[in-house]
């Protein structure tokens, strides 16, 4: 088992453990078509890491197969991507954004917009033929470049939209979250992210942009 040093710290925090257990527990009733006794419902427990990964580190899996570690904070502070250069495969997960079944790409910066966008552009500059996003889809060939271009545009557009909604709603994060949820989540068909996790993630993104606007306002007043 391997992860970043930040992930190791987070995993040992009681509040993080409680959140992981809660989100895992909430999703079990949403799983259909599988007998309940076949579902793994043991609560999450922290575990020891065998290796700490760092940005730029090269790990030889076997002869001729090396994985490069890329630190891409922004989605979460501990987030890592994995690039197999000789096979042009990138396992980017949420750091690249996530397209759903409708084709919409979600910008997933939960902790830092600028870091997320910088990481996204870093990934887009790599020579990639196979892109593995966090959920549902794998993109290949020319679809990879198209995905990255759309993901960058979606990220920048989301920030602009949230800034405008915050102005309209007088800075209320709760009202902005409710408006966005009504337009992009409530009308979406299944499968989709569990509602609790969606609201948690959306609130984090809107709150971050609200903080940026607040700091900008304070700076102008000085």
What are these regions (language model features)?
Residues 152-170:
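Charged, amphipathic alpha-helical linkers/stalks
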Residues 42, 66-157:
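Metallo-beta-lactamase
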Residues 62-63:
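Conserved N-terminal entry element of GNAT/NAT acetyltransferase domains
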Residues 164-222:
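C-terminal regulatory/interaction regions
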Residues 1-58:
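Active-site HxH/HxHxD metal-binding segment of metal-dependent hydrolases
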Residues 48, 135-138, 179-184:
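A general structural signal for short secondary-structure boundary/capping elements
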Residues 50-53, 57, 66, 128, ...:
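Amphipathic, soluble alpha/beta structural segments
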